[in-house]
Amino acid sequence: MTEHEAIVQHLQAVQNASRKIVTLDEDAINALLNDLADRIPDAAETILEANRKDLERMDPADPRYDRLLLNESRLNSIASDLRNVAALPSPLDRVLEERTLPNGLELRKVSVPLGVIGIIYESRPNVTFDVFALCLKSGNATVLKGGSDAAFSNIAIVELIQTVIRDRGLDPEMIYLLPAEREAAHILLNAVGYIDVIIPRGSQALIDFARKHSTVPVIETGAGIVHTYFDESGDLAMGRDIIFNAKTRRPSVCNALDTLIVHKSRIDDLPVLVEQLEEKLVQIFADEPAYYKLLNRYPDELLQIATPENFGTEYLSLKMSIKTVETFEEALDHIAHHSSKHSEAIVASDQATIDAFMKRVDAAAVYANTSTAFTDGAQFGLGAEIGISTQKLHARGPMALKELCTYKWLIEGQGQVRPA
């Protein structure tokens, strides 16, 4: 049997397992997730040893290193997240709409699983736990294609998950980890009839690859080219704190600030706006007006003149761009041209300007006077998320349990037939 044939055989088994998941009641699903959380401490050394093998192959200066890293604290957090998912209300079998037709037919629109969800992701082994929990809670089977950089970690995690599933007398094929080789991704992306939807989580290059090569429907998530616009009416202290938080809280995640846009009437305030960034050694790529305003006010080794490419970059590291604009309209145009439609923010005190920004900026999450770091399912009160959708169909913004469901119509009658 070729590797391609073996993968297809596994995909068929996952599809069969997905039909069994829908027969599980909510208590059985929650018990499995809680059991998995309870098993993590005993499995920690095995998982961390596998993770160390992955880390040894990566440069610690690589922005992906932090996302790849697991430790005891992060495993404890993962266990807590699993219990939190178990405690969430089930998104399944909810009556979304109901009506009685004039002919007496009773119609109900109810939430149901998507079926089999394929996830392609990079570096972050915690995603393996997160995705399984969210897919199971929403009644879906899961096919995972992790990156080769996290291969050892993902194998150890999936082995633990499948052990817990087997011990509870359930079908371990409800989760399947594809080989790390790139060819496996091509098979997944073209597994029409086996996979219901693909969700890529990672860099823009990964998302573009999935969109270009997939014949299975794709929900795009993750890539964020994020702006914060400091308006002429912005509060200086507020802007300074928001910029610092949005850039440095977790620079390797998709909601981190990439480009600060500053109204030219406030350019004299720019050194104060970015002064805290020096503490974290943030490298700044500034357009000429911003560069010369910061010269000798920000460390020379951390300051460069920006190129056009800087303004279309998702840095995922302690780097950012600064763009100065003459008008509010120019700020909107810059965002429209460079945004990935993930998260965008304004710092302003003029309500008319805030209202215009909120209405006219096209993004999944649009903020006024707060940090873009809040783009997160848990922060939105949605529970854990599978990613941040940057498209408009099916789901937009944090994809939590509800977004992992679709619906079907249930129609009950008393013998009605449709007239000729």
UniProtKB/Swiss-Prot annotation:
<comment type="similarity">
    <text>Belongs to the gamma-glutamyl phosphate reductase family.</text>
</comment>
<dbReference type="GO" id="GO:0050661">
    <property type="term" value="F:NADP binding"/>
</dbReference>
<dbReference type="GO" id="GO:0004350">
    <property type="term" value="F:glutamate-5-semialdehyde dehydrogenase activity"/>
</dbReference>
<keyword id="KW-0521">NADP</keyword>
<keyword id="KW-0963">Cytoplasm</keyword>
<dbReference type="InterPro" id="IPR015590">
    <property type="entry name" value="Aldehyde_DH_dom"/>
</dbReference>
<dbReference type="InterPro" id="IPR000965">
    <property type="entry name" value="GPR_dom"/>
</dbReference>
<dbReference type="GO" id="GO:0055129">
    <property type="term" value="P:L-proline biosynthetic process"/>
</dbReference>
<dbReference type="InterPro" id="IPR016161">
    <property type="entry name" value="Ald_DH/histidinol_DH"/>
</dbReference>
<keyword id="KW-0641">Proline biosynthesis</keyword>
<dbReference type="InterPro" id="IPR020593">
    <property type="entry name" value="G-glutamylP_reductase_CS"/>
</dbReference>
<comment type="function">
    <text>Catalyzes the NADPH-dependent reduction of L-glutamate 5-phosphate into L-glutamate 5-semialdehyde and phosphate. The product spontaneously undergoes cyclization to form 1-pyrroline-5-carboxylate.</text>
</comment>
<keyword id="KW-0560">Oxidoreductase</keyword>
<dbReference type="InterPro" id="IPR016162">
    <property type="entry name" value="Ald_DH_N"/>
</dbReference>
<dbReference type="InterPro" id="IPR016163">
    <property type="entry name" value="Ald_DH_C"/>
</dbReference>
<comment type="pathway">
    <text>Amino-acid biosynthesis; L-proline biosynthesis; L-glutamate 5-semialdehyde from L-glutamate: step 2/2.</text>
</comment>
<keyword id="KW-0028">Amino-acid biosynthesis</keyword>
<dbReference type="InterPro" id="IPR012134">
    <property type="entry name" value="Glu-5-SA_DH"/>
</dbReference>
<dbReference type="Pfam" id="PF00171">
    <property type="entry name" value="Aldedh"/>
</dbReference>
<dbReference type="GO" id="GO:0005737">
    <property type="term" value="C:cytoplasm"/>
</dbReference>
<protein>
    <recommendedName>
        <fullName>Gamma-glutamyl phosphate reductase</fullName>
        <ecNumber>1.2.1.41</ecNumber>
    </recommendedName>
</protein>
